[in-house]
């Protein structure tokens, strides 16, 4: 009992560590957040490991602890949401409510993976011992491998699609028409940049991109059209390569605009790190938000610039 309990806890914690992004541009990053996630994963794994022997002993009141754990993890989600929303006012580029909700939901769901993997590890151990009459050591080894396999499956299933999966990102030129009206690629009228110095900064230091939905799909274009998804793309650019602007410089705030004829999205930025390849990668790696999906399901069989369904 003692051995398999600790094995189940370790497997549960490992399942959480597998999903942690330790890149400084991702979450969790800071040591205090990392520590809190490890502690929460320990609590969740211990609950999952204890649940099996409790059920074997017909102690059904143990289900109460699961409900308390679920409530606690929902509180973690609320706390993460509140923390990120409180930081919005001091961000040069905001994440947006949709992106914040996605992050908070991810924090909650990934704690449940600890319960599932530790529960399966301990449960498989008892099945091997009682039904297949395997030795204690062999049962621990097999159940550990089963728990790790489940952890990999959960990690794969919880991976979100990114912009690179639904769209191509290509560089385009930034220019100005009628002296001060910004044009990105072939889309005019993005915004009015009144100061000559600001226009020169865009022309000399700016980068333009066009995000083109793959297969001319209306569904993919609809994801790009979502305001929350656009804001997430801008924030991902800001977090990866930076943006040259002060809080009192609205001219350099990126304004994504849809080209309705092509269903594409164009963006002009003045990055700190002027590298078009890094900019393209930042856009492609942006996760697709759950709130941006499914809004154009009825048009999934239609193509942009084509009549009728395919």
Regions found by a protein language model. Give the residues of each.
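Alpha-helical transmembrane segments and their membrane-interface junctions
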Residues: 63, 114-140
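Membrane-anchoring hydrophobic segments
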Residues: 1-58, 62
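Long, non-transmembrane cytosolic or organellar matrix-exposed soluble domains/tails
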Residues: 257-310
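Long, charge-rich C-terminal accessory regions
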Residues: 129, 133-134, 138-279
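Select subsegments of transmembrane alpha-helices in polytopic membrane proteins
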Residues: 35-40, 103-116
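Short membrane-interface loop/juxtamembrane segments of multi-pass integral membrane proteins
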Residues: 88-106
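A cytosolic-side transmembrane-helix exit/cap motif
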Residues: 79-92, 159-169
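Alpha-helical transmembrane segments and their membrane-interface exit regions
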Residues: 13-19, 66-78, 144-155
